[in-house]
Regions:
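Membrane-embedded alpha-helical bundles of multi-pass transporters/translocases
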Residues: 1-377
């Protein structure tokens, strides 16, 4: 590959990064407002602890089979067939993955619904009976959203592989909007449950229905089938398993936070959740945007076995990410107190809540560059 074509790839990554960064920025702003709405409508207490802990099991399924591994591994599988002028076969594999793995995720959600009570002991054993009951109820309410995340991740992957980033970038915006609307319009009557209803509604609209439409615009061809003998399906599984294990490990920090937090004073899980959400704003804006935008091009280079160009693009992307995240991390640590007060000062949080949230934000920001590198590696 010539230097000119390498520069062209860099420009494509930059253009795609711009689209994704704009989406991530808007999503993080909505994420700010989402957490602000929780703090404004509910405050911080054992009720909010139960709400945030209720994301643990759904998030685990999301990390394991939807949010990262399946969508990421499908892109190189599909681009492999496209690079070999076998796109029809690529659509056949797409249909198999959607059908077979869709049945699998539905089965996992059903098991989660059945055993949510037992799993609750592993997630937050320190909750009192009231918090535990609410925690289990909210978990069961939000679990079906993972079906939408799974299907949406595959339909988004098709769009990414086709160089279409706009509609997939809208998914988190609609998802966050659903949570906000659920809280604003339902929390006065149903309390924290209103936010959980918003989680389900946002997932259905943004991560499922909209992504089906986007995949249709990208030319997706789907016909249900269970052809698990196709080599493309097993290539997908082969690529997925190690990434499933690696990505699910990132879930461990959320589980640890909620496990230990359940033994601490009420609102501890809420403080930790607020701090982590704030840390993820610059992390997502830089790390997630660069990672999502660069991956389809890196996958294409790998499929074409252009390893020298792959290494060149990967190194330049990684260096750029570190160059941006290290100073952002330092600035966030230094300004954690005013940042937290700016976001949460006009809510039901007290000064002690703000101080605790600022401390967690500073602590989480220390590892921001490492979390950012994960999006690429």
């Amino acid at each position: 590959m010539s230097v000119v074509s390498t520069e062209t790839l860099n420009r494509r990554i930059a253009a795609a990064t711009g689209i994704v960064m704009a989406s991530v920025l808007l999503s993080r702003i909505l994420g700010f407002f989402r957490e602000w709405t929780v703090a404004h409508q509910i405050g911080s207490s054992g009720v909010t602890d139960a709400y945030y802990a209720a994301f643990t099991l759904p998030d685990f399924l999301n990390y394991l089979i939807a949010g990262a591994s399946l969508s990421v591994t499908f892109i190189p599988v599909f681009t492999k067939y496209a690079a070999e002028n076998r796109e029809d076969e690529g659509w056949h594999v797409f249909s198999t993955v959607v059908t077979v793995m869709g049945v699998a995720v539905v089965a996992l959600v059903i098991l989660g619904e059945i055993f949510a009570g037992r799993i609750a002991t592993l997630i937050a054993p320190g909750f009192n009976p009231g918090e535990r009951t609410l925690f289990i109820f909210l978990t069961r309410l939000m679990l079906p959203a993972q079906i939408c995340f799974y299907e949406g991740s595959i339909f988004s992957a098709v769009q990414y592989a086709k160089g279409r980033f706009l509609i997939p970038s809208l998914a988190p915006l609609i998802y966050n909007t659903g949570i906000i609307l659920g809280g604003v319009f339902l929390s006065s009557r149903y309390g924290i449950t209103g936010f959980a209803v918003g989680v389900l509604g946002g997932a259905v609209c943004g991560n499922f229905l909209l992504q089906i439409y986007g995949a249709h615009l990208a030319g997706a061809r789907f016909k249900p089938n269970f052809n698990i003998r196709h080599p493309g399906f097993w290539l997908f599984i082969k690529l997925s398993v190690p990434i499933m294990l690696a990505v699910s490990l990132s879930f461990a920090d959320d589980w640890i936070i909620r496990w230990f937090g359940s033994y601490l004073q009420p609102a501890s899980i809420t403080w930790l959740s607020y701090g982590k959400v704030l840390m993820r704003v610059p992390l997502g804006l830089v790390g997630q945007a660069i990672g999502v935008a660069s991956f389809p091009i890196l996958a294409q280079l790998y499929s074409e076995r252009k390893f020298e160009d792959l290494n060149r693009i990967l190194n330049s992307t990684f260096k750029g990410l570190i160059f941006l995240l290290v100073p952002i991390s330092a600035l966030t640590i230094a300004q954690s107190q005013p940042l937290v007060h700016l976001v949460f000062s006009h809510t039901r949080l007290h000064e002690a809540d703000l101080q605790a949230t600022a401390a967690t934000l500073a602590f989480f920001s220390i590892g921001m560059f490492a979390w950012g590198a994960q999006y690429i590696l």
